[in-house]
Amino acid sequence: MAMNTETLSLIKQSIKTIPNYPKEGILFRDVTSLLENAAAYKATIDLLVEQYRNKGFTKIVGTEARGFLFGAPLALELGIGFVPVRKPGKLPRATISQSYELEYGHDSLEIHTDAITANDKVLVVDDLLATGGTIEATVKLIRQLGGEVQDAAFVISLPDLGGEARLTALGLELVKLCEFEGE
């Protein structure tokens, strides 16, 4: 489905670039500036609704924390459940965990064991795709619980960091509203 170029431009222009944050040489893409712009935020959710309406999804999974900001409103608009994937120790019921590699070490994510069933067709939503490590871990959690996941949506993609290739290798179809070069 072709997306409106004018709307995509509004979204991309609302994302501020912060040089040398969090460290020297990084161009940080600040999605919080998009959230501050009601028209751009609404346009983002509306585009995702248009993209995924009537596709048969039963759940949206969002990864902590900014995935919640786009996944939850999308789930409401689609009339389906939202499932948060969180850092360890943040979910109150029984969970499963998946580790993933960071630049310097590793971390892990958790999901409630009863949040996804074998009947669920799941869309993963996050704000930014960089290396793909957190989304790969999220997909593994969903699949471990028996959910079907073949789609992931992102507001921002940084294709130079390899995440797109990593996730397509997992069999995911990706929707990215904005792409930025560099790190």
From Swiss-Prot:
Subcellular location: Cytoplasm
GO cellular component, one term: cytoplasm
PROSITE patterns named in the record: PUR_PYR_PR_TRANSFER
Pathway assignment: Purine metabolism; AMP biosynthesis via salvage pathway; AMP from adenine: step 1/1
Broad enzyme group: transferase
Keyword vocabulary terms for this entry: Cytoplasm, Glycosyltransferase, Purine salvage, Transferase
UniProt cross-references to NCBIfam families, sorted A to Z: apt, PRK02304.1-1, PRK02304.1-3, PRK02304.1-5
Role noted for this protein: Catalyzes a salvage reaction resulting in the formation of AMP, that is energically less costly than de novo synthesis.
Subunit organization: Homodimer.
Protein's name in the database: Adenine phosphoribosyltransferase
Gene field: apt
